[in-house]
From Swiss-Prot:
This protein's GO CC annotations: cytoplasm
Localization, UniProt: Cytoplasm
GO BP: any one term: rRNA base methylation
Organism annotation: Acetivibrio thermocellus (strain ATCC 27405 / DSM 1237 / JCM 9322 / NBRC 103400 / NCIMB 10682 / NRRL B-4536 / VPI 7372) (Clostridium thermocellum)
Family: Belongs to the methyltransferase superfamily. RsmH family.
Name of the protein this chain belongs to: Ribosomal RNA small subunit methyltransferase H
Reactions the enzyme catalyzes: cytidine(1402) in 16S rRNA + S-adenosyl-L-methionine = N(4)-methylcytidine(1402) in 16S rRNA + S-adenosyl-L-homocysteine + H(+)
Domain of life, per lineage: Bacteria
UniProt-listed Pfam families: Methyltransf_5 (PF01795)
Amino acid sequence: MEFQHKPVLLEETISNLAIKPDGVYIDGTVGGAGHSGEILKRLDESGTLIGLDQDEFAIKTSQEKLVQINSKAKIILVNTNFVNIKEVCQKNNIESVDGILLDLGVSSHQLDEASRGFSYNKDAPLDMRMDRRGELTAKKIVNEYGREEIKRIIRDYGEEKWASRIAEFIVEARKKKEIETTGELVDIIKAAIPSSARRGGPHPAKRTFQALRIAVNNELGILAKTIEDGTELLKPGGRFCIITFHSLEDRIVKDEFNKKVNPCICPKQFPVCTCGRKPEGVLVNRKPIVPKEKELEENPRARSAKLRVLEKI
């Protein structure tokens, strides 16, 4: 099966990476190689692309595709999570890089491949692991976690106002039978949310599925650490581009980038800074970049995408 993934905000991302032909660039989420391919087109034989993805299938399918695009530039592909960018660079004797890209969306391939269990529109085993080597699955969470912990996950990671009822219904349902598939979970969620609240708006299971995916893959903790390590790796003038798809991720990126721009922790009443923390970067755009109408028509999944860009000082 070919890895189908339409890159989001492609033109805007490539433009903001400000690619140098001899530069070193990290794509922390290779996916279908849409962004990676465009980066490679702009590199010469002195340039390097480091592509990471915790989905083994993405790495396998990208290898051949990328070599066909540019056989002269150095291509390093690693089946790992982007949280390990420092270790990957150390292993390859790379001290600093010119640009880093993270596209935090679940790829169209993963959404469409039923067996991954990411989609509430297709019945499949409850999995949701980006990296199939991981032990924690959505099935384990809904069948083994306590009601309060399930409620916390759905409330905090899904921003779901019906989190308490959904958690209660999950715990009741599993007393009768283990919850094994996405279809079973969708039915439980629909039963938990009053019909009046389900009229209009997104699919009733959307927020709960998002929450479980974030919990299974520790997405928010990993993101904050990667921003810290990635900024450290960047050369002065190097850029960090991150595409988010929901408010939780965007808030973390916004807050972490702002810490790099204004790291001072002195009380506001202090006339001068005494903490000694120096800015590490500047925001390239004050507001996030969002897709143009034309892109939304061609790719509705891009609707919630936001791109934020930090430039290292």
